[in-house]
């Protein structure tokens, strides 16, 4: 190879360093300044039941936290089924590889990003009760989402009932 080819190869290598540099993604924004956004997070149990999927749910709530101002987000609604099974001690690997406790912790960890920043409403679903299939009303939701958890709830929380025993 002659000098010209070496110089060309060097320039291309240096140039790729600058071309592949990551930039912060373009933030979504509202077209009407008077508008606001409400975010819906449906059925996250598919994210919490496998350890490999848990970071995906955390990315969703991170995106919400990072978009509060640009999208004028006023609240988040999660439609329930935070976990696949409320009281599973030994996962079968097919319907998840996380115990119920690990699933509840993953859901709680994802929502921590919104605590103190944004009010959110989490509805419990049938997967959040009982041992496997909502055969009783036992639910670990109050253990991971106590009423005192998010200071943004103070203006909107009306009542909290005890867990059915």
Residue ranges and their predicted role:
Residues 88-165:
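Extended active-site neighborhood of metal-dependent phosphoesterases/phosphodiesterases
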């Amino acid at each position: 190879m002659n000098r010209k080819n070496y110089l060309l190869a060097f320039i291309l290598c240096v140039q790729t360093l600058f071309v592949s540099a990551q930039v912060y993604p373009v933030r979504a924004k509202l077209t009407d300044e008077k508008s606001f956004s409400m975010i819906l997070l449906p059925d996250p149990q598919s994210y919490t039941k496998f350890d490999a999927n848990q970071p995906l749910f955390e990315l969703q709530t991170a995106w919400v936290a990072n978009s509060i101002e640009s999208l004028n987000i006023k609240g988040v609604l999660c439609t329930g089924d935070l976990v696949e099974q409320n009281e599973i001690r030994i996962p079968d690997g097919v319907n998840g590889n996380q115990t119920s406790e690990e699933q509840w912790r993953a859901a709680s960890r994802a929502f921590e990003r919104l605590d103190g920043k944004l009010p959110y409403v989490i509805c419990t679903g049938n997967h959040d009760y009982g041992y496997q299939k909502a055969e009783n009303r036992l639910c670990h939701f109050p253990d991971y989402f106590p009423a005192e958890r998010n200071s943004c709830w103070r203006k909107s929380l009306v009542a909290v009932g005890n867990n059915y025993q």
